[in-house]
């Protein structure tokens, strides 16, 4: 996959994209990430990229002729253009899977008060990472790239890891444990030490359902349950009812 990012602050991406799985994916040629400075497309000596908004108001707006030229220069015929914006559709795991199937992405990082509305005609999709305001689109872009990268074949060491993580099946991930088996007065659940793979699988499924019910019950409203999940959920609800 090829990912291009347009930003006024390219140095912000140096450390995050040169660590951990994204670094390995880039070194192996699985992902190509290009960071382009919007200021390189400024059209005056002062390299001005923003200006005061027509009609007055606070803040500055990224200029259409600068950002528009940058998008035209960087994007290819098959590029899907994304603009990180609090006005966009909320990002979720289903959307991440859809974006991970594309070959080329261009992520536009806004700044200041926003971008000239005329550039929006060049944007295919606006994406938000939450209902809060950040200084610019750089941090949301990093979140998006990290989420997408994990789903690309070859990036994670275990191909099943992405499928088993939280939200992949509209469920939160089951509890994880490692050595030592005893920590203070807390013990690792015996089933995980049993070596019985089927019992372990069923325990993890049940724990995922329980954890989702307790922490994110909204996720269960949109999930299609298989027969095993229905049975496990009934066990959970029966147990909770009897504890009252």
Swiss-Prot record:
Its EC number is 2.1.1.228. GO terms for molecular function: tRNA (guanine(37)-N1)-methyltransferase activity. The keyword DNA repair does not apply. One of its GO terms (cellular component) is cytosol. InterPro entries: Alpha/beta_knot_MTases, tRNA_m1G_MeTrfase_C_sf, tRNA_m1G_MeTrfase_TrmD, tRNA_m1G_MTases_N, tRNA_MeTrfase_TRMD/TRM10. GO terms for biological process: tRNA N1-guanine methylation. Keywords: Cytoplasm, Methyltransferase, S-adenosyl-L-methionine, Transferase, tRNA processing. Signal peptide: none annotated. It is found in: Cytoplasm. The keyword Lipid metabolism does not apply. It comes from the Bacteria. It catalyses: guanosine(37) in tRNA + S-adenosyl-L-methionine = N(1)-methylguanosine(37) in tRNA + S-adenosyl-L-homocysteine + H(+). Its main location: cytoplasm. It is an enzyme of class 2 (transferase). S-adenosyl-L-methionine binds at residues 110, 129-134. Homodimer. Specifically methylates guanosine-37 in various tRNAs. Belongs to the RNA methyltransferase TrmD family. This is tRNA (guanine-N(1)-)-methyltransferase. It comes from Syntrophomonas wolfei subsp. wolfei (strain DSM 2245B / Goettingen). The lineage of its organism: Bacteria, Bacillati, Bacillota, Clostridia, Eubacteriales.
């Amino acid at each position: 996959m090829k990912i291009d990012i347009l930003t006024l602050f390219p140095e912000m991406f140096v450390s995050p994209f040169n660590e951990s799985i994204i670094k390995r994916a880039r070194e192996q040629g699985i992902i190509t990430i290009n960071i382009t400075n919007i200021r390189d497309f400024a059209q005056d000596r002062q390299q001005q990229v923003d200006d005061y908004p027509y009609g007055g108001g606070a803040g500055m707006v990224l200029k259409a002729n600068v950002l528009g030229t940058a998008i035209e220069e960087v994007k290819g015929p098959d590029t899907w253009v994304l603009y990180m914006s609090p006005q966009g559709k909320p990002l979720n795991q289903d959307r991440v899977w859809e974006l991970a199937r594309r070959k080329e992405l261009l992520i536009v990082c806004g700044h200041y008060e926003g971008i000239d509305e005329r550039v929006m005609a060049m944007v295919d999709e606006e994406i938000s990472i939450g209902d809060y305001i950040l200084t610019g689109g750089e941090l949301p872009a990093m979140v998006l790239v990290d989420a997408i990268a994990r789903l690309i074949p070859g990036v994670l060491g275990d191909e099943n890891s992405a499928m088993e993580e939280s939200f992949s099946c509209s469920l939160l991930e089951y509890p994880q444990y490692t050595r030592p088996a005893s920590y203070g007065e807390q013990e690792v659940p015996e089933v995980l030490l049993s070596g019985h793979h089927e019992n372990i699988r069923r325990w993890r499924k049940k724990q995922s359902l329980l954890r989702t019910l307790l922490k994110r019950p909204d996720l269960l409203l949109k999930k299609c349950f298989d027969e095993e999940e229905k049975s496990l959920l009934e066990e959970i609800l029966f147990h909770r009812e009897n504890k009252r």
